[in-house]
Swiss-Prot record:
Induction data: Down-regulated in leaves and apexes by cold stress, but no changes in roots and hypocotyls.
Gene name in the database record: FAO1
KW Secreted (keyword) present: no
Subcellular localization, as worded in the UniProt entry: Membrane
Metal-binding in keyword set: no
Phylogenetic classification of the source organism: Eukaryota, Viridiplantae, Streptophyta, Embryophyta, Tracheophyta
InterPro entries for the chain: FAD/NAD-bd_sf, GMC_OxRdtase_N, GMC_OxRtase_C, Long_Oxdase
Keywords of the record: FAD, Flavoprotein, Membrane, Oxidoreductase, Transmembrane, Transmembrane helix
SS bond partners: none
First-tier enzyme category under EC: oxidoreductase
Official protein name in the record: Long-chain-alcohol oxidase FAO1
Active-site residues annotated for this sequence: H681 (proton acceptor)
Tissue: Mainly expressed in floral buds and apexes. Detected in roots, stems, leaves, flowers and siliques.
């Protein structure tokens, strides 16, 4: 790893203390489950050939080790207790408690727990490894005990994520050598990126105390007074922006550029390029919402959302695709939102692309994008280069953990830099609790007026609340956080928290041995998304001209293992040995169905039949592309490990296999097989509408209920975009921010 990085991104448990609260019997059951998921195996069980750059000693170590070894079960319990929904915690603890008893083991495992020796019935941890594996294989497919299946799926994800992302104080994991993974040690950063570009505008509450915070804020040019009776710091400014991502960063820049004093609240921390470690585990923990392990309430979908200065733009995969014409037409005509048919919006897209340095070329593509491009070309399919907010020769597979080279131009490197230069102040480690609302008496038609935000620092050393009073308040926390904040503030519009679109994702994979493929590289090397194939719609009256888009993902070993199907311990270890050459393609759909998020951390969502059909078409096309690119084996992430070896079947059999592929429901569904979906794009949960029946905010982004409260993030988009939405979010935010500037001008008259 890079020698210099931020302590929070370095890895290695600092205090060696676990505080998950699990009993010793529960931990014993958990460790025995972890052992089944990733067991120790004899070397004679190894059936596949190791890769040339991997030593037999490294493979032997990996083959003999187990996920039951300290500290993995404790890490799993820690993640579970701190990051998971309460229902999941209760379910899993009940299962672990039952498995710690003989009667409970009999209820969950049946006759396999019987023994010839006294007391004749074993608890789970006393059963042989072989019998425990048979039990978990039964759980995997059993349609009558789906809660147990869900518990297994949850533990499988956490166990494998913890095992393959755990690092010591030196940033190393001994299993990585066996699977051919390494973290880039590139220390050469551009001179412009060596410093902290936002330093003069940042107040980091994790470094503050009650006695220092007021002085730090005052030194940044803010009007601060102490209300010692109520233990509140009162801050006055022109505009308060909650969130620093694609929407908040743009808003802060535009408003401060118009001469207004802006304060940005960000609950995450600030990291400069030199701070990034490219370590999957510590980076996910610090840079993503809920440490990158945020699941829907039924655990069907895992959601990725940024939680750091720069928000999603700091950790996204660089794709910069303009809003499709068909989408703009739909929003302007079907939703009567004239903004999206104006030259103002088209001009905003150009301004955004120029500010974040979008380029449309790619000098050298990484392995997975080579696979996508070659497969499409061999099939005669159109494949496009994806514009990125980096240079054409940017060859970095670590941008999902923050770009260590400082080339990717997130808001923390662009819009927020402009804002700080214009006097904006960014307060990190500070979470908004509610908007400050009062009854509106000025006859604007809105019942409430927003006066600012009440917030709290997340550092235990700062116990004072912050009451930030402003002329305008902008909510830019993203589609998962803006609705709960508005609802907790007392707003009632029925659209708040509804209409949530996720761009659901399923993956397909193909294995390309180095000895049989002309495509070079490993899946974690090179630009993450540089190519895209659009699966066209055959119906001119369809919801979209494109049924699905096919791109490539960023998959560190922890994410790869978490999403990969588990059939047995042996099969899984063999899959991991093939990790660096197992190319993945993601199928993303423009979902017509929508979910809801009205309480923080609780997302409900279900695909429609229309969406499933589009997903099926995308998955099948992705498999054809992988085969055409030269994969020797292809498959999906369906729970039963659905796959086929390309050279061992006829063309007709291959076609039959591909035609059989379709998306499944989640682990709680009654079917034998199931899927885990992912989502990195959340939109529409506080959508713009022509009236308060159609949306939560108007065409200017202002709440229909509260004067002076604006939304400026992905939540105000009317529908799903259908492509990577960063340019759409920033362009919409740019237009909304300029309208907020106009609002402030009118307010001064």
């Amino acid at each position: 790893m890079r020698k210099e990085c931020h302590p929070l991104l370095r890895g290695g448990r600092k205090d060696n203390k676990f505080r998950q609260g699990f009993s010793s019997s529960e931990m014993e059951s958990l460790a025995s489950i972890c052992e089944v998921i990733l067991p120790p195996l004899p070397m004679d069980a190894l059936k596949i050939k190791k890769h040339d750059d991997v030593s037999i000693e490294d493979v032997e170590f990996f083959w003999n080790t187990s996920a039951s070894h300290y500290p993995i079960p404790h890490e799993v319990a820690e993640i579970l207790s701190k990051r998971s929904l309460i229902e999941a915690v209760i379910l899993i603890r009940v299962v672990l408690w039952l498995l710690a008893t003989r009667l409970g083991t009999f209820l969950l495992c049946g006759l396999l727990c019987f023994s010839e020796k006294w007391p004749f019935i074993n608890n789970f941890s006393s059963m042989s490894l072989k019998k425990r594996e048979r039990v978990m294989q039964w759980w995997l497919k059993n349609r009558f005990i789906t809660p147990i299946r869900l518990a297994f799926a949850y533990l499988k994800v956490l166990c494998l994520f913890a095992y393959f992302t755990w690092v010591d104080e030196n940033g190393d994991n001994p299993a990585w050598k066996a699977i051919g993974y390494e973290v880039s040690a590139d220390e050469k950063l551009p001179n412009s990126s060596n410093g902290r570009l936002l330093e003069k505008g940042i107040v980091e509450t994790m470094h503050e105390t009650n006695s220092t915070l007021q002085q730090s804020l005052t030194e940044k040019g803010l009007n601060v007074t102490l209300d010692s009776r109520n233990n509140i710091l009162k801050v006055k400014c022109d505009a308060i922006v909650v969130g620093s991502g694609c929407g908040g960063g743009v808003a802060a820049s535009v408003l401060s550029g118009a001469g207004h004093k802006v304060v940005v609240l960000e609950k995450g921390n600030y990291f400069a390029p030199r701070d990034y470690s490219s370590l999957e585990g510590p980076s996910m923990d610090q840079l993503y919402e809920t440490g990158g392990i945020l699941a829907s309430v039924d655990s069907r979908i895992l959601l990725l959302a940024g939680s750091t200065v720069g928000g999603g733009s700091a950790v996204n995969w660089s794709a910069c695709i303009k809003t499709p014409h068909e989408v703009l037409k739909e929003w302007s005509e079907n939703h009567n939102l004239s903004l999206f048919s104006t030259s103002e919006y088209l001009s905003a897209m150009e301004t955004v692309c120029e500010r974040i340095g979008v380029t449309e070329s790619c000098t050298h593509e990484g392995f997975q994008n080579q696979v996508l491009r070659k497969g499409c070309q061999n099939l005669g399919l159109k494949v496009d280069y994806v514009p990125r907010n980096s240079s054409g020769n940017h060859f970095c597979g670590s941008c999902g953990y923050g770009c260590p080279k400082g080339e990717k131009q997130g808001t923390q490197d662009t819009w927020l830099v402009d804002a700080v230069e214009n006097g904006a102040v960014i307060i990190t480690g500070c979470k908004a609790e509610r908007f400050l609302l009062e009854n509106n008496r000025n006859g604007s038609g809105r019942k409430k007026k927003c006066l600012g935000v009440l917030a709290k620092a997340l550092s235990s050393r700062v116990t004072m609340k912050l009451q930030i009073e402003a002329k305008v308040t902008i909510s830019a926390g993203g589609a998962l956080l803006t609705p709960p904040l508005m609802i907790s503030s007392g707003l009632k519009n029925k659209n708040i928290g509804k209409n949530l679109h996720l761009h659901p994702v399923l993956m397909t994979w193909g294995y390309f041995p180095e000895s049989t493929s002309e495509l070079k590289g490993k899946i974690f090397e090179g630009g993450i998304i540089t190519s895209v194939h659009k699966v066209p719609s055959r119906d001119s009256n369809s919801y979209s001209d494109t049924r699905a888009i096919i791109e490539t993902p960023s998959l560190g070993p922890g994410s790869f293992a978490s999403l990969c199907p588990w059939e047995s311990g042996l099969d899984f270890k063999e899959r991991m040995l093939n990790y660096p050459r197992t190319a993945h393609l993601i199928t993303i759909i423009r979902d017509k169905a929508c979910g809801q998020v009205t309480t923080e951390g609780r997302v409900s969502y279900k695909l429609s039949a229309f969406d499933k059909e589009n997903m099926k078409c995308g998955l099948q096309q992705a498999l054809r592309i992988l085969k055409a690119a030269g994969a020797v084996e292809v498959g999906t992430h369906r729970s039963d490990g659905q796959r086929v070896k390309c050279g061992e079947v006829s063309e007709n059999e291959m076609a039959e296999f591909i035609d059989s592929v379709c998306p499944m429901e989640g682990a709680l569904s009654p079917g034998e097989n199931w899927n885990i979906y992912t989502s990195a794009h959340q939109m529409g949960s506080c959508r713009m509408g022509m009236n308060e029946k159609e949306g939560a905010v108007d065409e200017n982004g202002e709440s229909w209920e509260a004067q002076g409260l604006f939304v400026c993030d992905a939540s105000l988009l009317p529908t799903a975009v259908g492509v990577n939405p960063m340019i759409t979010i920033q362009s919409t935010a740019y237009c909304i921010s300029n309208r907020v500037v106009d609002y402030l001008k009118r307010d001064q008259i």
